[in-house]
């Protein structure tokens, strides 16, 4: 899989795309009570944070997660507005190269 460093999503585009995918699939993958909680609390305490892919993704995918091309977006709620997300609803792995659409999600259990 050949990828181009000059054809990547920006960090903001990556966050936006991950959040859009999360919203589209949340109803089918989260407990209904979690969906209600997230929707009620998101404006005050919700967020999405961008990271390099964590090591444990290797248990779920069988390809190289080069941080130049892959990002992990954590979506959830924080204790306080602007705080660190500690109530995680989904971890989204995205390929940032625009010609290689790839997404894996680990949902809250």
Swiss-Prot record:
Recorded family membership: Belongs to the putative dsDNA mimic protein family.
Protein name: Putative double-stranded DNA mimic protein Ent638_2296
A family per Pfam: DUF440
Source taxon at top rank: Bacteria
InterPro entries on file: dsDNA_mimic_put, Put_dsDNA_mimic_sf
SUPFAM superfamilies per UniProt: Putative dsDNA mimic (SSF102816)
Role of this protein: May act as a double-stranded DNA (dsDNA) mimic. Probably regulates the activity of a dsDNA-binding protein.
